[in-house]
From Swiss-Prot:
Cell compartment(s), UniProt: Cytoplasm
Kinase is among the record's keywords: no
InterPro entries, A to Z: PRC_barrel-like_sf (IPR011033), PRC_RimM (IPR056792), RimM (IPR011961), RimM_N (IPR002676), RimM_N_sf (IPR036976), Transl_B-barrel_sf (IPR009000)
Protein name: Ribosome maturation factor RimM
Keywords from the named record: Chaperone, Cytoplasm, Ribosome biogenesis, rRNA processing
Domain comment quoted from the record: The PRC barrel domain binds ribosomal protein uS19.
MF terms (GO), sorted A to Z: ribosome binding
Keyword Coiled coil on entry: no
Listed GO biological process terms: ribosomal small subunit biogenesis; rRNA processing
Function: An accessory protein needed during the final step in the assembly of 30S ribosomal subunit, possibly for assembly of the head region. Essential for efficient processing of 16S rRNA. May be needed both before and after RbfA during the maturation of 16S rRNA. It has affinity for free ribosomal 30S subunits but not for 70S ribosomes.
Assigned protein family: Belongs to the RimM family.
Highest rank taxon of the organism: Bacteria
Short name of any one Pfam family annotated for the protein: RimM
């Protein structure tokens, strides 16, 4: 049985698109080929469990949106597609595109400590990523609050993966929301 860390979540199926079995995927990956290049992918239900393999037939990004529309083999109508809504789209954890120096995979940010100064204490830990118009980091503080921080260079100017932390320079009031 495969462990959960054997898999990399690249998106979540959020809705059906049309009548022919197409599905909308909210990506958790900066690599569009995860949703456009045919080949094997895996699905895992909301309850967890063992992922099941499915073949991606084709995909495209919706113009002006971060969502992708995908077609899977054997999913040819709306009813079949509706059974997949809410599932996580996975690839094997070792299926990671090569990155240039200084680049990183967004999912590698989960678990990093968030600091306000390079040598200061952590104010919390990155607990999730939320994809949308702009990516958001969900940071869970030591008292259990959840902060949503825009993942933009002006607010997150440094990411130190090997050291296990990132630097925040939030505008006044952002941490109080």
């Amino acid at each position: 049985m495969a462990e959960s860390n054997d898999w990399l979540s690249v998106g979540k199926i959020v809705a059906v698109q049309g009548l022919l079995g197409e599905l909308r995927v909210n990506p958790a990956s900066d690599f569009p080929e995860r949703f456009t290049v045919p080949g094997p992918r895996w699905l895992r239900s909301r309850q967890g469990g063992e992922p099941s393999e499915i073949q991606l037939k084709k995909g495209r990004q919706l113009p002006g949106k971060s969502l992708f529309v995908v077609r899977f083999e054997g999913v040819d109508n709306r009813s079949a597609a509706e059974t997949l809504v809410g599932m996580e789209l996975l690839v094997p954890a070792d299926d990671r595109p090569e990155l240039a120096e200084g680049e990183f995979h967004l999912l590698d940010l989960v678990g990093l400590k968030a600091r306000l100064t390079a040598d200061g204490p952590a104010i919390g830990t990155v607990s999730d990523l939320i994809s949308g118009g702009n990516d958001l980091l969900e940071i869970t503080t030591s008292d259990g609050r959840k902060l949503l921080i825009p993942f933009v260079e002006a607010i997150v100017p440094e990411v130190k993966l090997k050291a296990g932390w990132l630097l925040l320079t939030p505008p006044p009031g952002l941490l109080e929301l």
